[in-house]
């Protein structure tokens, strides 16, 4: 942390003496404007961003010169996600957000993997389970894997340190309608439920007392199928409210209002509260994940 502060002072000096136009520097000194984050400006780092976790998990990525291929289970996907979070946090100075919807497809990958394992075990002992029993065994093991994966993210984020000596400022986005189909939506609901349960429980401090971790922050989206009592996912909203009452997270976003304000789109803020403006790529598609914020001026 001290090294980061020292580097920041050097950057601030270079920014005011050499990099910024004189009129901008003078306006900042006189209080007409405030040029933010001059302690990082010399290296042209960006502030906060939305991590395109989906692209890196589905198509693979490279970390420290090592090829990371598409994961073959939910728990591995969660582990890779924490590595990506650490690398992103070490190369920017603001917050970052990931979406649980980008992890949801790997629940079914694990489901099929576990099913094959259970069938193999049947053959080993020379017996065959009825289909309903087989499905129940698979789902029980799957829930254990989801618990393990969510716990990996929770504990990795609060225990790892970035290159500037801090834990990553991470926000986790929980948006059911981001799922691509009904099966994936149900799987996403399981991840959201486990995330809320673990946050409600908290983590133990050095004295063994359950406390509220600072990160990751949580954002829960209110939508048509979880806002009304009796709706399919209302139980998640009840759990979220219970969690907020005890742990002060999640924060909430109204899908309906955000779509009114953001040209029909609903997406996470970047870390804390900075929210992107709608933008379309060269193909006319809205793009949010993979974008960042830089050069803030008040």
Label the predicted regions.
Residues 1-298:
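Conserved catalytic cores of very large enzyme subunits
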